[in-house]
């Protein structure tokens, strides 16, 4: 399947409409809950149905939800974190907003994220680096300057009920965004029922959350 995908999106870039038709035929979107095992979903697609489907899965998590966002949180997931069923909802963000100039629009977006952070069900970690050597166990950090747009978080995965017996892991190259759904060449895997995979991704999520969100008044524990 991935060979077919690679051939379909190969050089030179194929026209958009035939490409989207081919990828939706190759990787049709499941209806409702994904089947057990692994399902591939390739982009670009003709509509935002895949993004909305991811949001529905997140919204219907029963115990816990964990997501990463590299370029701000899209509106559809703001609604998820405002109204989802799960009593425990974590989000790991590169930054509070999409890249935008300072102004009223950015302030409104930051306020919206802060409102979500204030909800007792939500725990958000937003990328930053340690700025002091004065806390025992931590060393002052600086950025490498390798990438001006993504400095801390560039993982793309969602964990739905990862601590249960029937977890769902969604991972791959696509950000949970409109661009990665309808414009970019991306590939995602939806893995249902594999508790080992869910454990690994949950461990990675909490490792990154520790780095960007830890209480620096305490010595880090391993």
Question: Residues of each region from the PLM?
Answer:
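Extended, H/D-rich, highly charged conserved domains that either
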Residues: 1-4
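Surface-exposed intrinsically disordered loops and tails
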Residues: 7-39, 116-147
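PLD/PLD-like phosphodiesterase catalytic module centered on the HKD motif
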Residues: 75-222
């Amino acid at each position: 399947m991935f060979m077919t995908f690679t051939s379909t999106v190969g050089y030179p870039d194929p026209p958009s409409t035939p490409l989207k038709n081919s990828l939706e035929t190759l990787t049709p979107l499941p209806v409702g809950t994904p089947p057990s095992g692994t399902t591939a979903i390739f982009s670009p697609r003709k509509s935002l149905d895949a993004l909305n489907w991811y949001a529905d899965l997140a919204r219907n998590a029963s115990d816990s939800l964990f997501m990463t966002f590299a370029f701000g949180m899209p509106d559809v997931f703001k609604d998820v974190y405002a109204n989802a069923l799960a009593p425990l909802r974590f989000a790991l963000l590169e930054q509070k907003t999409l890249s935008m100039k300072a102004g009223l629009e950015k302030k409104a977006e930051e306020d919206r994220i802060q409102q979500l952070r204030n909800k007792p069900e939500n725990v958000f970690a937003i990328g930053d680096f340690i700025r002091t050597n004065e806390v025992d166990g931590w060393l002052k950090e600086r950025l490498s300057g390798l990438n001006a747009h993504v400095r801390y978080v560039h993982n793309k995965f969602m964990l739905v009920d990862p601590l249960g017996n029937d977890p769902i892991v969604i991972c791959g190259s696509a950000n949970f965004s409109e661009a990665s759904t309808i414009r970019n060449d991306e590939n995602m895997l939806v893995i249902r029922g594999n508790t080992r995979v869910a454990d690994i991704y949950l461990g990675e999520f909490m490792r990154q959350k520790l780095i960007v969100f830890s209480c620096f008044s305490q010595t880090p524990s391993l």
